Amino acid sequence: PDCFTISYNKNRGLIIQFNVKLTILGGSKASAIVEKDYRRWYQEMFAPSVMAGIIKISDIAGYRSNQVYIRNSKHTPLSPEAVRDAMPVLFNLLKNEPDAWTRAVLGHFIFTFIHPYMDGNGRMGRFLMNAMLASGGYRWTIISKDIIDDYMAAIEKASVDGDIREFATLLSGIVRNNK
């Protein structure tokens, strides 16, 4: 990609991020906004990849219709049929959890555990996490490349062993150090 494409994609992401934060901080319930808009966010995020011919438009039209496997992971995401049952349960959990921090950690983890799309689940999980964080007054948080291995190991442990403590502790440190 040329500099214009990179700049365009970065600015597009910033605009989406700004609109999400503005809506959530404006008093709207974060879980309702995410449930209503996350599919559109996904399509907006990946539209440039469709336009570039990297992925097919059908790949961003809805939940995946094939089984997906994660490279270098022992976790096998839910079947396509189970995804359709699990996503409403996730959004119900987010609606009923009063604590923004808990919504952020569980929302991110459960979304990536379900893995509803063929690609981009980690990015969408982090986007969902940030929407929940913003609803609690936390700053937008980036998982930097220098800790990506720790992040991936923590999410792998949570997904495979069912132990989310390391993942929650890692996210807590990242959010706390995000000034």
Predicted features along the sequence, with ranges:
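FIC/Doc superfamily catalytic core
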Residues: 1-179
